[in-house]
Amino acid sequence: MTLAAPIAVYVLAALAEIAGCFAFWAWLRLGKSPLWLVPGMVSLAVFAWLLTRVDADFAGRAYAAYGGIYVTASLGWLWLTEGQVPTRWDILGGGLCVLGAMVILAGPRAA
């Protein structure tokens, strides 16, 4: 099993989820226009659709593996969009999350 396809989908899903959630953050915390919610909701719908594209027998397993990718993507957002450099603890935690996601994705399954 190749991990490239699900990881690519998870990365795209993470970007869609973070962008959608940030639209709400911008509206509620940064005083942006409520119109920010329109692309935010579209982005969240794209996120949900993308998660259904992962070849997994159970939604919970797909979501659990996604979580590790999401944490790492969030740290990238923190750095690239918000200008806050992740700490070494952020990086260590993100790495552990990705490792956990890889274990979930690549672990053997009963036939």
Curated annotation (Swiss-Prot):
It is a multi-pass membrane protein. The keyword Hydrolase does not apply. Coiled coil: none annotated. The keyword Transmembrane helix applies. It comes from the Bacteria. The chain crosses the membrane at residues 7-27, 30-50, 62-82, 91-111. Keywords: Cell inner membrane, Cell membrane, Membrane, Transmembrane, Transmembrane helix. Pfam families: UPF0060. One of its GO terms (cellular component) is plasma membrane. InterPro entries: UPF0060. It is found in: Cell inner membrane. Its main location: membrane. Belongs to the UPF0060 family. This is UPF0060 membrane protein Pden_1837. It comes from Paracoccus denitrificans (strain Pd 1222).
